[in-house]
C-alpha cells in the first residue's frame, strides 16, 4: 500500500484497488493478483545488474551493483547509478566552461525503460548492463518478437511484449508507447557522433 501511495503521489496516477482489474493487476475470474502485479511490487524476483569494467572485453570489474524490488524501484536505482557511470568531461574556452557527458541522459533513460518494459519475464535471468570506457550495453532477455526485425524497430514499429505493463508505464508518462524510443536513442547518439549504437 505504501508503494501504491508513493506511485500515486509521484506520478499523479490512481492505482486504487478498484482499478486493479482494469490495469491488469488482478484476474477478473478469480480475483487473484497477476504476474504483472508481482513484477510491479516489491516482491518482484527479477533484478537488474550493472557492471562497470576497466577493459574493452568486459572481463575486469571496476564496480558492480544489483538492484531488486519493484521494477519502478529498479528503474530509479539503476538510472541514478548509471548517471554516476556516465563520465562528464569539462572543457574551458575563454571564460566559458562546457560540460559534455559520454552519453545523453535521455538516451540512457530510454534504453533502460526499453529493457525493463519489453523484457521476457518468463525467464528468471537479470537485465544486464555493461559499462566500460567505450560503450554502455543493455542486455534484456527475450530478443525481438517473432516477425519483427531490427529494421522494423529502427522505423518505429511498436509491438509491446508486455502490453499491460506498457500501458501502465504510459499512464505514468514514463514511455510514449508509440515506438519512438529506439529512434530517439539513435537521434540522440547521432548528435554526439555515435553512428552505430
Predicted feature locations:
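Active-site helix-to-loop segments that bind/position phosphate- or nucleotide-bearing substrates
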Residues: 1-4, 8-123, 131, 136, ...
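Glycine-rich phosphate-binding loop
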Residues: 2, 161-166, 170-188
Amino acid at each position: 500500500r505504501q508503494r501504491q501511495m508513493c506511485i500515486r503521489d509521484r506520478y499523479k496516477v490512481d492505482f486504487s484497488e478498484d482499478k486493479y482489474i482494469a490495469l491488469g493487476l488482478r484476474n477478473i475470474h478469480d480475483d487473484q493478483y497477476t504476474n504483472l502485479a508481482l513484477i510491479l511490487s516489491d516482491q518482484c524476483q527479477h533484478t537488474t545488474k550493472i557492471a562497470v569494467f576497466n577493459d574493452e572485453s568486459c572481463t575486469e570489474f571496476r564496480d558492480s551493483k544489483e538492484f531488486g524490488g519493484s521494477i519502478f524501484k529498479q528503474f530509479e536505482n539503476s538510472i541514478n547509478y548509471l548517471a554516476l557511470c556516465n563520465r562528464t568531461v569539462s572543457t574551458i574556452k575563454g571564460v566559458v566552461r562546457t560540460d559534455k557527458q559520454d552519453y545523453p541522459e535521455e538516451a540512457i533513460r530510454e534504453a533502460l525503460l526499453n529493457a525493463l518494459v519489453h523484457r521476457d519475464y518468463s525467464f528468471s535471468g537479470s537485465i544486464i548492463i555493461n559499462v566500460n570506457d567505450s560503450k554502455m550495453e543493455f542486455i534484456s532477455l527475450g530478443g525481438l518478437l517473432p516477425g519483427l526485425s531490427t529494421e522494423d524497430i529502427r522505423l518505429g514499429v511498436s509491438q509491446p511484449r508486455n502490453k499491460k505493463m506498457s500501458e501502465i508505464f504510459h499512464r505514468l508518462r514514463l514511455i510514449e508507447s508509440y515506438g519512438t524510443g529506439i529512434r530517439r536513442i539513435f537521434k540522440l547518439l547521432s548528435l554526439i557522433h555515435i553512428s552505430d549504437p
